[in-house]
Amino acid sequence: MNSIKEIKEFINTNGNSEGCLENFIDEHYEEFEEIDFNYVETLETDERRWYIISTVVYEVYKNNMLLGYLAINEVTTLKSESSSYSDLFVDVEAYEVKKIVKESFEIIK
């Protein structure tokens, strides 16, 4: 996989109830061997009774070269010690995102 689009499509095609990105990568290790995901920020969260789903933005690197950014909709918190990700039937979903940099100014007195 050499582009954000390829990675996004692979995740969305194969994201069958692993629940979180880490489990998904473990399940598909060979495909993600050269890919690194670095946490950037959490965009939103949806709190459920037994778990929390968040949309998390990651920088995506291949061989230390930035490919771009992906937002991953995934389970970020299990509230019950007796639950596992496979109990939830939550698919990992990926979205392309772009970084927006805001610039502001402050008066110096």
Q: What are the residue ranges of the model-derived segments?
A:
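Generic marker of "main functional regions" within proteins
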Residues: 17, 21, 68, 79-82, ...
